[in-house]
Design a protein with these regions (language model features):
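A generic "binding-loop/recognition-motif" signal
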Residues: 144, 163
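Short, contiguous, well-structured surface segments enriched in hydrophobic/aromatic residues
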Residues: 97-102
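Basic, amphipathic alpha-helical recognition segments used for DNA target recognition
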Residues: 1-17, 109, 134, 153-157, ...
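Sequence-specific dsDNA recognition surfaces
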Residues: 70-91, 106-134
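Non-catalytic DNA-recognition/assembly elements of restriction-modification systems
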Residues: 1-91, 217-237
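Short, Lys/Arg- and Gly-enriched loop/turn segments at beta-strand edges
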Residues: 145-152
Length: 237
């Protein structure tokens, strides 16, 4: 009797319900021309869904878009040392007393950057071309691409490698405005991908012509720029 009751209890015992949390499906539409341009490849990895959605958000925004670079773009100049000559910087490292402090691209966002190495003044390169200039926007073009920094008092005249793109703008107020956009999740995602949404491993100045930026009113751009400039001024103190 006891054994039969035990068997009955085991039989009617409810099994614990296991809930599987499903990840939301990521999707986007892809034009036929994009598919053809990508070698008629249909793998999802070829088209970064979030990157394409980011571009769609910008294109459908209330302000419309303007190109970051190009004839009608916001940028005046975008270059890195040796870009025109297509040559790499030849570095000669030395002790502190014989050279210039040399900063790594990863240090351009540091609050108190200190040179990791020293480059000899005898190196076959234009040292002035390597020095950063105040009121310039910086982008890392290789390695960890897409890092963005603003050259204020702290970085002014510091020597950085050719792995950093230097950018100036036609209108000064666009400096802080574009900085804020490229630091945002949407802006940085667009910066690190191409027009098809694929992640790129290297940024050249020409890539900036493919970057859409919200064409906000000038007064809003000026306000954003002023806030960025003030924030960096406080960091410099």
């Amino acid at each position: 009797m006891v054994s039969s009751n035990l068997a009955l209890q085991l039989e009617v015992t409810t099994q614990p319900k296991i809930e599987v949390q499903e990840s939301p499906v990521k999707w986007c539409s892809v034009s036929l021309s994009d598919v053809v341009s990508r070698g008629i490849r249909l793998e999802a990895s070829v088209f970064d869904v979030e990157a394409k959605q980011a571009r769609e958000k910008i294109s459908k925004g209330i302000y419309g878009t303007v190109a970051l670079a190009g004839d009608n773009g916001l940028i005046e100049t975008a270059y890195y040392p040796g870009w025109i000559q297509r040559s790499r910087l030849k570095r000669i490292y030395c002790d502190r007393e014989y050279g210039e402090g040399f900063y790594l691209p990863s240090q351009m966002t540091d609050i108190y950057p200190k040179p990791e190495k020293y480059i000899s003044r005898l190196a076959d390169c234009d040292m002035d071309e390597l020095r950063l200039k105040k009121n310039t926007l910086l982008l890392t073009r290789s390695g960890t691409i897409g890092s963005v920094a603003y050259v204020s008092k702290t970085l002014d005249r510091c020597v950085f490698s050719d792995d950093v793109i230097r950018i100036t703008f036609k209108e000064q107020y666009d400096l802080g405005y574009v900085y804020a956009f490229l630091k945002s999740k949407v802006g940085n995602l667009i910066l690190r991908t191409n027009g098809y949404g694929s992640v790129i491993t290297h940024i050249e100045p020409g890539h900036l012509e493919e970057i859409p930026v919200p064409n906000a009113p000038i007064e809003l751009r000026k306000r954003v720029n002023d806030l960025i400039v003030r924030s960096y001024a406080l960091r410099d103190e």
